[in-house]
Amino acid sequence: MEDKIKFKQWDNEEKKYYLHEETEEDLRNFLIGTLETYLDDCKDEVGNPDIIERWSCKVHGNEDYIKASISNCGEYLNIEVSLFDKMSVTLMAHRDGLDVYNLLEIGMIWLHPNYLQYSYQLINVIDHVAWVLGCEKSQYMIMNPKSFEMGFLFYNGFDLNIVDMDGFIYLEKHYRVNHDFIRIKGQESNAPTEG
């Protein structure tokens, strides 16, 4: 018998959460269907992103981890969703496997420049996933490695500043007490400059 993943789902009529159980396949199909809807809205501008290349759904302890990878004419939009104790949904999208730090853990969306104009739709996707799975909040920031000066996110007692300098991504941990920081050199960003 196939193991099922437990999650809470909000009932609008009853105004309460109910515990649901779905198979790994059903949960995966829900996520991919949601992503397909989002990408369908983008296809007029970026081509027809109708190829689902890879997918997986895994459970690690109390954390449910779902990953879908969509290819559009050779350009990849990798989307990962992690459900932390059903309290929040964090989604990361990044280009061509570029992974700067653990953006999933600190709640960031890494978006290819071609998709930035559709960022509001992607936020709706995250909120919808959070709502369906009974999460109390969704966490996200939208970053473009060639068009932002500074991004801020408060996380785990630190102010994390993501800084783009000379095509490199840096992570600064600012301690709130004395404002000292540690700068860590990230991976080179080769995303095209907009405009």
Language model feature labels by segment:
Residues Y140-M150:
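Conserved beta-strand-loop-alpha-helix junction that forms the acyl-donor binding cleft
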Residues D164-G195:
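C-terminal "cap" of GNAT-fold acetyltransferases
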Residues G107-Q117:
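A short, internal acetyl-CoA/4′-phosphopantetheine-binding micro-motif in the GNAT/acyltransferase core
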